[in-house]
Amino acid sequence: MAFDKDAFLTALDSMTVLELNDLVKAIEEKFGVSAAAMAAPAGAGGGAAAAVAEEQTEFNVMLMDAGANKVSAIKAVREITGLGLKEAKDLVEAAPKAVKEGLSKADAEAAKKKLEDAGAKVELK
């Protein structure tokens, strides 16, 4: 029995979603396959989408070292965080330590620049 592919596609095109669902179930039973297995190759393409979704949106400003001029680093920490003198001094002396967490990239870069200008070593994580 010759079967025309175009006629088959036309028949599929005219089916409702419910009829298509029944067809998929019948194919699964007839050929012993699973529609979920068919989705696995598409999951590989989803891996690329997941990599894009993993792009970092929140950054933590980590003070690694206060540098030679600890006073300037303390002033910069106070400006960035709004901490008092004692709290800022304790934070600088406890390096490596997070100065600020959950910042946007622009805010994190600005804080990093301010700390580096004060002579501190800083990392964004």
Curated annotation (Swiss-Prot):
Disulfide pattern: none
Organism domain of life: Bacteria
InterPro entries: Ribosomal_bL12, Ribosomal_bL12_C, Ribosomal_bL12_C/ClpS-like, Ribosomal_bL12_oligo, Ribosomal_bL12_oligo_N_sf
MF terms (GO), sorted A to Z: mRNA binding; structural constituent of ribosome
Entry keyword annotation includes Ribosomal protein: yes
Cellular-component GO terms for this entry: cytosolic large ribosomal subunit
Pfam families in alphabetical order: Ribosomal_L12 (PF00542), Ribosomal_L12_N (PF16320)
SUPFAM superfamilies: ClpS-like (SSF54736), Ribosomal protein L7/12, oligomerisation (N-terminal) domain (SSF48300)
Keyword terms: Ribonucleoprotein, Ribosomal protein
Record-level GO BP terms: translation
Family per similarity comment: Belongs to the bacterial ribosomal protein bL12 family.
Subunit and partners: Homodimer. Part of the ribosomal stalk of the 50S ribosomal subunit. Forms a multimeric L10(L12)X complex, where L10 forms an elongated spine to which 2 to 4 L12 dimers bind in a sequential fashion. Binds GTP-bound translation factors.
Reported function: Forms part of the ribosomal stalk which helps the ribosome interact with GTP-bound translation factors. Is thus essential for accurate translation.
UniProt xrefs under NCBIfam families: L12
Stated name of the protein: Large ribosomal subunit protein bL12
Gene source species: Variovorax paradoxus (strain S110)
